[in-house]
Regions:
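Hydrophobic anchor at the beta1->P-loop junction of P-loop NTPases
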Residues: 8
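P-loop (Walker A) phosphate-binding loop of NTP-binding proteins
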Residues: 11
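Conserved glycine(s) of the Walker
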Residues: 15
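Conserved Walker
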Residues: 18
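Conserved substrate/cofactor phosphate-moiety recognition/catalytic segment
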Residues: 21-87, 108-109
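Glycine-rich phosphate-binding loop used to anchor ATP phosphates in small-molecule kinases
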Residues: 65-127
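A glycine- and Lys/Arg-enriched "phosphate-lid" helix/loop adjacent to the NTP-binding pocket
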Residues: 122-174
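NTP-dependent small-molecule kinase module
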Residues: 171-210
Length: 210
């Protein structure tokens, strides 16, 4: 197989963007790694979008179409590499990273028919995708939420923070449930320590994605 990929899933404060940067650095420093890389952040795959200053939430069908279009961007690249035949990973290989993808969809539409998202997951598996679900310990939720935008919480009622923590914990649990249903192989990483470089090494070496 000429292609491999990582899908980063998790709540807003779990560290997806920080880990994405660390993975980019790790892959770039490996002399034998792929020269061809496709990285799509969450703005290319999430459900809620800021469109010209207004927040727009995609329907289930719209979001499925969006995810399918992203996979359809990657598949022809892999087909071309396969057409060329065997070759070194550096020259013929393709490495991709996607953020907030199939698990985000499953968690947002848990009661929907799974046929279409399962078919998409089959295609992701054929493209060598592995999913990393980033989570926090419950007791770290408040600290992580505050660390992102400290000024935002100044003067706010305590109840607002309690609700934000509940939302984080509930979303994490929902993502775990959906990961168990998904066809895409998934590993969970607790990001309490914020050791992004070590998490990247763990993914690329110890988990056998390298």
């Amino acid at each position: 197989m000429n292609i491999r990929g990582i899908i980063l899933e998790g709540y807003s404060n779990s560290g997806k963007t920080s880990l994405l940067r660390a993975l980019k650095r790790y892959q770039a420093q490996d002399e034998a790694s792929e020269s061809s890389v496709v990285i799509l952040g969450e703005h290319y795959s999430q459900i809620l979008h800021n469109v010209h200053g207004k927040f727009v939430r995609l329907s289930r069908e719209q979001h499925l179409d969006l995810l399918k279009s992203r996979v359809d961007l990657i598949k022809p690249l892999n087909d071309w590499a396969n057409f060329l035949g065997p070759g070194r990973r550096k020259s013929r290989g393709l490495f991709f990273i996607l953020e907030r993808f199939h698990l985000n969809h499953r968690a947002a539409f848990p009661e929907a028919d799974e046929i279409e998202i399962t078919e998409l997951e089959k295609q992701l598996c054929e493209l060598g995708a592995n999913c990393i679900l980033l989570t926090l310990s419950n007791e770290k939720a408040e600290e992580r939420i505050k660390s992102r935008n400290p000024d935002e919480w100044v003067g706010k009622p305590r109840e607002d923070m309690e609700q934000a923590c509940e939302d984080l914990i509930e979303t994490q649990n929902n993502l775990r449930i959906q990961a168990a249903k998904s066809l895409v192989p998934t590993k969970e990483i607790n990001t309490d320590r914020k050791d992004w470089n070590e998490y990247a090494r763990l993914i690329m070496e110890d988990y056998g994605f390298a």
